[in-house]
Amino acid sequence: MPTINQLIRKPREAQKARDKAPALQSSPQKRGVCTRVYTTTPKKPNSALRKVAKVRLTNSYEVIGYIPGEGHNLQEHSVVMIRGGRVKDLPGVRYHILRGVLDTQGVKNRKQRRSKYGAKRPK
């Protein structure tokens, strides 16, 4: 515990807020190329095969992005758009891949929350 005099000589330094999505470099989205598309298992107590992709961004960061929705068409060398947002039960996955943008197709037969999954309005 510092004394009053010590605090007058050298005030307390405010802690800097840590960026939750550093690879975006303050952009809303970033473009990148898939280097590997694979499935991984979530941590306890959940159980599934979550679809993820390793993406090399235009700023040469390499990040892991989650592919939301049922089914996807991504493979190696697909060009994707990435946004921030982690997946709580997948350690190391801090980004989401946007559906219906660039090489990523929207989710088929999606009726609700369509804008989040790049699905057109059904006729």
Curated annotation (Swiss-Prot):
Residue(s) carrying 3-methylthioaspartic acid: 89
PANTHER family in the cross-refs: 30S RIBOSOMAL PROTEIN S12 FAMILY MEMBER
Subunit structure: Part of the 30S ribosomal subunit. Contacts proteins S8 and S17. May interact with IF1 in the 30S initiation complex.
Region named Disordered: 1-32
A Pfam match: Ribosom_S12_S23
Superkingdom of the organism of origin: Bacteria
Sorted UniProt keywords: Methylation, Ribonucleoprotein, Ribosomal protein, RNA-binding, rRNA-binding, tRNA-binding
NCBIfam families: rpsL_bact (TIGR00981)
Described purpose of this protein according to its UniProt entry: With S4 and S5 plays an important role in translational accuracy.
GO molecular function: rRNA binding; structural constituent of ribosome; tRNA binding
Descriptive protein name: Small ribosomal subunit protein uS12
Basic and acidic residues biased stretches: 10-21
GO cellular component: small ribosomal subunit
Database matches in InterPro entries: NA-bd_OB-fold, Ribosomal_uS12, Ribosomal_uS12_bac
Family: Belongs to the universal ribosomal protein uS12 family.
Record organism: Azorhizobium caulinodans (strain ATCC 43989 / DSM 5975 / JCM 20966 / LMG 6465 / NBRC 14845 / NCIMB 13405 / ORS 571)
Cited Gene3D superfamilies: Nucleic acid-binding proteins
Biological process annotations from GO: translation
Keyword Transmembrane helix: no
